[in-house]
């Protein structure tokens, strides 16, 4: 009888532990800097605060492809993005904010490796906290199969 009670209590604990976190995957393709700042940088901070106020954790993954490669380069001035004046004007600050998302908020950044050559990018051109994956579809499928809510952020 004690074993049954223990199993029931452990099962309840596991169920509650699963309910203690929420998960979201952002499908990031936008090249619009204002949208990126509002829908990712500011939104993640606000959403994390919301869930923390409810004693829940929010797990965040951002899958990078399309027009969004530009935000994750070591130096956009040495890439095809060298003509994006808005990006170049604020990139030092932007780069710090994005790194803070990885370091402070434990945001996972996954980049589509298949699209990198189209943009003239190699692994050495990408900031160190971004993990390069074979393609964006794999990242999105994997996270959605793990129960992540899907949020597209495109143009």
Go through each PLM region and give its residues:
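Sec-dependent N-terminal signal peptides
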Residues: 4-13
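Acidic/histidine-rich, surface-exposed loop or edge segments in extracytoplasmic proteins
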Residues: 18-33, 76-81
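Structural recognition of the beta-strand scaffold that forms the well-ordered cores
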Residues: 23-27, 61-64, 108-111, 152
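N-terminal targeting signals for Sec/Tat export/insertion, comprising classic cleavable signal peptides
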Residues: 26-56
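Solvent-exposed coil/turn segments that connect beta secondary-structure elements
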Residues: 31, 65-68, 114-115
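Surface-exposed patches in mature extracellular/periplasmic domains of secreted proteins
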Residues: 51-62, 111-113
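Acidic helix-start/capping segments at beta-turn-to-alpha-helix junctions
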Residues: 58-73
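A cross-taxonomic marker for long C-terminal extensions/tails that follow the last structured domain
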Residues: 73-155
């Amino acid at each position: 009888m004690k074993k049954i009670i223990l199993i029931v209590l452990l099962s309840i604990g596991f169920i509650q532990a699963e309910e203690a976190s929420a998960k979201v995957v952002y499908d990031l393709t936008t090249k619009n800097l204002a949208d990126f700042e509002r829908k990712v940088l500011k939104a993640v901070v606000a959403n994390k605060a919301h869930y923390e106020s409810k004693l829940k954790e929010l797990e965040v993954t951002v899958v990078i492809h399309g027009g969004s490669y530009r935000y994750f380069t070591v130096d956009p001035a040495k890439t095809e993005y060298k003509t994006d004046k808005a990006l170049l004007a604020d990139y030092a600050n932007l780069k710090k904010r994005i790194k803070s998302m990885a370091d402070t908020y434990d945001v996972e950044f996954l980049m589509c490796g298949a699209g990198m050559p189209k943009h003239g990018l190699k692994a050495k051109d990408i900031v160190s906290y971004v993990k390069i994956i074979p393609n964006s579809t794999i990242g999105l499928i994997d996270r959605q199969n793990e129960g992540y809510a899907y949020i597209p952020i495109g143009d």
